[in-house]
Amino acid sequence: MGFKVDLFEEEIVDNTKSYMFCPNHTSMIDVMVMLSVARNPFVFVGKKELTKIPIFGFFYKRTCIIVDRSNSKSRLAVFEAARKRLSNGLDVCIFPEGLVPDDESIVLSEFKNGAFRLAIEHQIPIVPMTFYDCKKRFSYTFFSGKPGKLRVKVHSFLSTEGLTLKNSDALKKQTYNLIYNELVNDLKKKITFSNISKIKK
């Protein structure tokens, strides 16, 4: 497809431990990027709608705990399944935004609580991840995007040791702010570079 993943890791996962991966979510290709950079076996918690996509859906179902967001029983069952995977030593990846926003001008949507509550319950680190280029390279808007580099940053882990569920909102906010600021700063760099290029011309 003409994509090359460029990975930068501030901290490297230990294959004897479990983690909760929390990347931003802007594109269908996010799932494939996550699979390409993961060092440990893991499962996604993912939405039912994506299973209907030809070819992609076939592989998606085999790497995901599927959630039907319109069904409260399904949501509860999903988190019970995630708990079992974590108890068995697997990592879990949850896109905490839940859905890709329809408005592509949104930098980062509000985070849901599930990933942070699960991480605290199991006392495992949050691994914030920034996907910089997936929206630009492979947007949900058809016939848009182009091949190129897909930059991924694994941020320093956020410990949940000693935290309780009362701390889940603060942990969620900390993770959100870290990824949001990273995306905004990257956008500022691109705007500055673009302006310099125009001046030189």
Question: Which residue ranges define each predicted feature?
Answer:
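Short gly/ser/thr-rich secondary-structure transition/capping motifs
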Residues: 1-8, 75-76, 134-137
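Catalytic core of membrane glycerolipid acyltransferases/transacylases, capturing the structured
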Residues: 1-2, 15-72
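Glycine-centered loop/turn motif at secondary-structure junctions
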Residues: 2-4, 64, 89, 123
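Generic preference for hydrophobic
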Residues: 7, 21, 44, 94, ...
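Structural signal for conserved beta-strand scaffold positions within catalytic alpha/beta enzyme cores
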Residues: 7, 44-46, 66-68, 128, ...
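Short coil/turn linker and secondary-structure boundary residues
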Residues: 8, 69, 163-166
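Glycine-rich helix-loop-beta junction characteristic of Rossmann-like nucleotide cofactor-binding loops
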Residues: 9-14
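Non-catalytic C-terminal accessory region of glycerolipid acyltransferases
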Residues: 77-201
